[in-house]
A protein has these predicted regions:
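General structural feature for long, well-ordered alpha-helical segments within catalytic domains
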Residues: 6, 70, 132, 211, ...
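Oxyanion-binding "anion nests"
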Residues: 193-255
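C-terminal active-site/capping subdomain that shapes the small-molecule cofactor and substrate pocket
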Residues: 246-363
C-alpha cells in the first residue's frame, strides 16, 4: 500500500523523469510493472541479490521482515548503494538516518557528508507530530510533550482497513431494519449494534478485536513496563530525527487505534521552556515549512479542517486547538491531523530520492 502511494506521488511530481526505475516484487516477479508514463521492464524477483546489487539506490516498502532478510545479504555481497526504507528494522541503527526533510534537512545533509547510506522513514505518528510542531522543536522551545493518539486503520496495513470497512458494513446491515422504522427505539438499535460487534463472526482477522464503533487502546508490542512499542517510538525516534540523542526531550503518551481509514490524529500537551504569547507560538508553527497549516482555535474552523475526513489525501498537516492550559503559562494544548500514507510514510521516501538525485547520485 505504501509502495502504491509512493509510485502515485512519484508520477505526480514527475520523479520518474529523473531516474531509471526497476521494479521488484516478492510475489509477482515477471508481471507487468506499474504505469509511470513510459515503458518499464517486467517486475523482477525482490530476492534476487545480483539484480538488486546492480542498483545505486533501493527503496523498500516491503516491511521489516524483508529488510531483515535482504539488507544484510546485500551488504555482505559488497553492495555500497543507498538503502531507503519505510520499515522500522534499521531506524535506530547508528549507521542509519531517519528522514523527514522539512524538519531535519541539516541532519540528512550531515549524514550524506559522512557517508551514511541508510535513510529510513520514521514512525508515521512521530513524523506527523513533528511536521505539525516543527516550529517549536526547531527553536528548542519544548521542554516535554505528551501525545494521545487517534490512529487510523491504515497504520496496521491494508488488511486492517478492509476489516474496518467490513465491520462497518456488518454493523450497518444489522441496524438497517430498525433504522428504517421511525417507531423503533434507539436502545434497540444500540442493542443490535452491540450484539454485532460482539459476535464471533465479525470480520476481525487483522484487527483482532472490533474497531468499527469502538477503539483499540494498545498498538504494537508490550515492552513489559506498561508501555507499548508504539508509545516508546515517540521519544526514541523523535529525538533521533531532531539530532538530540545526547539531550533528549521527554515524550510519551497513549497510542490508540480508532475507526478512521488513513489519517492519524493527535492531542498534544506541551510544556514550553518559557512562557510565549499565543501569537508567537502560532507564528513559529506556521513559519516552519510549507505543509503545516495553523487552524484558528474556533469551533467552525476546527470542525471543518481538523478531521480525518477533511485531511485524507492531502499533504497539508493542520494543527489547531492551540490554547494555554490552566496549569500555567508554559503549558500548551494542540490537536493535529495528518495523512498516514503521505507524510506518515511515502512522502519522506519520495523526497529522499530527489535529495540523492540533486546530490549527484547516478540514475
Amino acid at each position: 500500500m505504501v509502495g502504491s502511494v509512493l509510485v502515485q506521488r512519484m508520477r505526480e511530481e514527475r520523479d520518474f523523469d529523473q531516474v531509471e526505475p526497476v521494479f521488484f516484487s516478492t510475489s509477482q516477479a515477471g508481471g507487468k510493472g506499474p504505469r509511470i508514463g513510459r515503458d518499464v521492464e517486467p517486475v523482477k524477483d525482490a530476492r534476487d541479490i545480483a539484480a538488486l546489487k546492480a542498483l545505486p539506490v533501493i527503496i523498500s516498502c516491503q516491511g521489516g521482515d524483508y529488510t531483515s532478510e535482504i539488507y544484510p545479504r546485500l551488504r555482505q555481497a559488497g553492495w555500497q548503494g543507498y538503502w531507503i526504507d519505510a520499515a522500522s528494522a534499521l531506524r535506530m541503527k547508528d549507521d542509519a538516518a531517519i528522514i523527514l526533510d522539512p524538519v531535519n534537512m541539516p541532519k540528512i545533509e550531515e549524514a550524506l557528508s559522512t557517508g551514511i547510506k541508510n535513510y529510513i522513514g520514521g514512525n508515521c505518528t512521530v513524523s506527523l507530530m513533528l511536521m505539525a510542531m516543527a516550529g517549536l522543536f526547531q527553536r528548542d522551545e519544548i521542554e516535554w510533550m505528551t501525545s494521545m493518539t487517534y490512529q487510523a486503520a491504515s497504520g496496521a496495513g491494508a488488511a486492517a482497513m478492509r476489516d474496518l470497512v467490513a465491520q462497518m458494513a456488518r454493523v450497518g446491515r444489522s441496524a438497517e431494519p430498525l433504522l428504517e422504522d421511525p417507531a423503533s427505539v434507539i436502545l434497540d438499535i444500540d442493542r443490535a449494534v452491540t450484539e454485532t460487534l460482539r459476535s464471533a463472526d465479525l470480520p476481525k482477522s487483522n484487527t483482532e478485536f472490533p474497531l468499527a464503533g469502538s477503539l483499540l487502546p494498545w498498538i504494537d508490542k508490550d515492552l513489559g513496563n506498561g508501555q507499548s512499542r508504539e508509545e516508546w517510538k515517540a521519544q526514541a525516534e523523535a529525538n533521533k530525527i531532531l539530532g538530540r540523542n545526547g539531550n533528549a526531550i521527554p515524550m510519551d503518551g497513549v497510542c490508540v487505534r480508532i475507526g478512521a481509514m488513513r489519517c492519524h490524529s493527535q492531542a498534544l500537551t506541551i510544556k514550553l521552556r518559557r512562557p510565549l504569547p499565543m501569537d508567537e507560538v502560532e507564528g513559529m508553527l506556521a513559519d516552519a515549512h510549507d505543509w503545516v497549516k495553523v487552524v484558528p482555535n474556533r469551533r467552525e474552523e476546527s470542525l471543518a479542517e481538523l478531521t480525518p475526513a477533511a485531511v485524507t489525501g492531502k499533504l497539508s498537516v493542520p494543527v489547531g486547538r492551540l490554547r494555554k492550559l490552566p496549569m500555567g503559562e508554559g503549558y500548551l494544548a494542540a490537536f493535529t491531523v495528518g495523512d498516514q500514507l503521505l507524510w506518515g510514510a511515502a512522502e519522506p521516501l519520495r523526497r529522499m530520492v530527489r535529495i540523492l538525485v540533486d546530490a549527484g547520485v547516478k540514475r
